[in-house]
């Protein structure tokens, strides 16, 4: 936990989900730069906030006036809720998911520059369509994470944009809303999957082509399951792994799980195309948390990037959740880069960890408390 001093007071902020021996703060100087701009240049009380990460922006900006938040990440919204409770504040007000529309016009917009360039483009288009002409927009990020093409993209999608002075290794960018769409973002994109072309909405992993890890995983899916088996595609992205399983085993009941709203939207649209008659559900949340059920099979290709943070902390959390959510005799089937050494983590959690396939870069493991499921023959 760290103390966050901002223009309207002080907050105690904790990074969520919590990790042992956390070394990172729940805020950075890009947050402070945006709040400084809000304090000095706000046009009115109501602020729209995009891509807050841990609650620093909406909690602090509430000292200026009412806020509306918008973004794609469940974990970011959950962190805001938890930090509000930590500081004895009211539950958050309006939150807009990517396809939502503004119910009222904000006086200004503050926005963290997202890591994914595609999501940045899509959000700039969204702002151009939603905001009244002339509404001030301020974007910020840490220098080391900013894309070089940010100002050209602002000019393309908003009709204007400029970089301002750097401050404590952060940089601010400013624009005014054009009042109408200037350019159509090329999303969703489409990638080739084993069942056909798959939609991939902005910001979802593997925007231009199916990643090589997923391609290898597709060759090591189960060939049989109990009738009516309950399966989770954990961290589903565009849904290709779960959909490939449904192509082979259409009677299983599948839950697509992701913390990205746009990932689940991609999976849902692809399931409508390629698995229209299947029993599919969609869970927006922190992995399997919040699902009151157990599974015969969990399929997982865990990310090792959490925003700009690299590590195995996401995989560790999803491994633990999977162990708790498996039925007796159920299996976690997981793929990972060979150099990440997931077998050590998995061996500490599961009685049995079998290598089901490997190449120079990837390994597929079947993990169970006892027997597992049959692998697809090589």
Locations of regions flagged by a protein language model:
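SAM-dependent Rossmann-like transferase core, predominantly class I methyltransferases
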Residues: 19, 24-28, 33-37, 166-228
């Amino acid at each position: 936990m760290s103390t966050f001093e901002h223009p309207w007071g002080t907050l105690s902020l904790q990074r969520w989900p919590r990790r042992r021996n956390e070394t990172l703060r729940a805020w950075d100087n890009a947050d402070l730069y945006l709040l400084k701009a809000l304090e000095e240049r706000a046009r009115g009380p109501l602020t729209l906030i995009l891509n807050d990460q841990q609650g620093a922006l909406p909690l602090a900006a509430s000292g200026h006036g009412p806020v509306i938040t918008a973004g794609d990440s469940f974990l970011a919204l959950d962190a805001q809720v938890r930090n509000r409770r930590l500081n004895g504040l009211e539950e958050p007000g309006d939150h807009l998911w990517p396809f939502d529309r503004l119910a009222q016009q904000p006086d200004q917009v503050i926005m963290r520059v997202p890591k994914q360039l595609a999501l940045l483009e899509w959000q700039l288009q969204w702002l151009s369509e939603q905001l009244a002409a002339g509404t001030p927009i301020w974007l910020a990020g840490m220098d080391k994470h900013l894309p070089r093409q940010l100002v050209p993209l602002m000019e393309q999608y908003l009709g204007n944009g400029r970089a301002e002075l750097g401050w404590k290794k952060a940089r601010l960018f400013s624009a005014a809303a054009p009042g109408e769409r200037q350019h159509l973002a090329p999303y969703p994109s489409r990638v080739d999957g084993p069942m056909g072309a798959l939609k991939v909405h902005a910001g979802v992993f593997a925007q231009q082509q199916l990643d090589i890890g997923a391609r290898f995983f597709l060759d090591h899916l189960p060939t049989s399951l109990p009738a009516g088996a309950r399966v989770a595609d954990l961290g589903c992205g565009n849904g290709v792994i779960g959909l490939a399983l449904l192509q082979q085993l259409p009677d299983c009941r599948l839950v697509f799980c992701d913390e990205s709203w746009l990932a689940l939207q991609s999976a849902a649209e692809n399931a409508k195309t390629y698995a229209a008659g299947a029993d599919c559900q969609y869970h927006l949340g922190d992995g399997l948390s919040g699902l009151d059920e157990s599974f015969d099979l969990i399929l997982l290709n865990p990310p090792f990037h959490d925003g700009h943070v690299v590590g195995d902390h996401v995989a560790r959390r999803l491994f633990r959740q999977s162990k708790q959510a498996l039925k007796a005799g159920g299996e976690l089937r997981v793929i990972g880069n060979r150099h990440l050494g997931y077998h050590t983590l998995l061996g500490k959690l599961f009685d049995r960890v079998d290598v089901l396939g490997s190449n120079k870069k990837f390994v597929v493991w079947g993990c169970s408390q006892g027997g597992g499921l049959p692998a697809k023959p090589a």
